From Swiss-Prot:
Protein name from the UniProt record: Pyridoxal 5'-phosphate synthase subunit PdxT
Taxonomic superkingdom: Bacteria
Binding-site residues for L-glutamine, renumbered to this chain: 46-48, 106, 132-133
Gene this protein is translated from: pdxT
Biological or metabolic pathway of the protein: Cofactor biosynthesis; pyridoxal 5'-phosphate biosynthesis
Swiss-Prot/TrEMBL keywords: Glutamine amidotransferase, Hydrolase, Lyase, Pyridoxal phosphate
Subunit structure: In the presence of PdxS, forms a dodecamer of heterodimers. Only shows activity in the heterodimer.
Length: 188
């Protein structure tokens, strides 16, 4: 197994660091050749509009979507979740990978100054995770499993087959529970 981390923009170094700690083979994905070498992909948090532009400019956008639709496990955090979604409510014309049957609203928990940490349940354990200009999942389609919610009831982590996403940034906490779950995605 080789995990790729899309490394065009955003918090990719933090994901690479966690994968190193987990002794998992991993590479940065910046080109189509890089993408061809991976069996799993992480799309990091960052700025979704910039990430979209960079994936299109690099020629990776369609290749990433094709690999995901062919069954490659993928995990998106924050902006990565926006990129995986099928619809962005506040930017209805924003192009997405459309690989995860959810609708999202960008920056729904507030601006940068409104960033916060919260304890959430994830797979029967509690983890404290940061929400930084985080998107909110406003709708989920059939076949989408909820992995985590805030106390308010807001859905903050989901999975649909080989695709998972979180509104929060577990890569910034040093904890590895979410990444460990992703590494087993599709192996169960």
């Amino acid at each position: 197994m080789t995990v790729g981390v899309l490394s065009l923009q955003g918090s990719f170094y933090e994901h690479l660091s966690i994968l190193s700690r987990l002794n998992t083979d991993h590479i940065q994905v910046k080109t189509s050749e890089d993408l061809s070498r991976v069996t799993r992909l992480i799309i990091p948090g960052g700025e979704s509009t910039a990430m979209l532009a960079l994936t299109q400019k690099s020629g990776l956008f369609d290749l990433v979507r094709d690999r995901i639709m062919s069954g490659m496990p993928v995990y998106g955090t924050c902006a990565g979740m926006i990129m995986l979604s099928t619809f962005v409510e506040d930017f209805p014309n924003q192009k997405t990978l459309s690989c995860l049957d959810i609708a999202v609203r960008r920056n729904a928990f507030g601006r940068q100054i409104n960033s916060f940490e919260s304890e959430v349940s994830f797979l029967n354990s509690k983890i404290t995770v940061p929400f930084i200009r985080a998107p909110k999942i406003t709708q989920i389609g059939e076949g989408v499993d909820v992995l985590s919610r805030l106390e308010s009831g807001d859905i903050v982590a989901v999975r649909q087959g080989n695709v998972m996403a979180t509104a929060f940034h577990p890569e910034l906490t040093g904890g590895a529970a979410v990444h460990e779950y992703f590494l087993h995605l599709g192996l169960e």
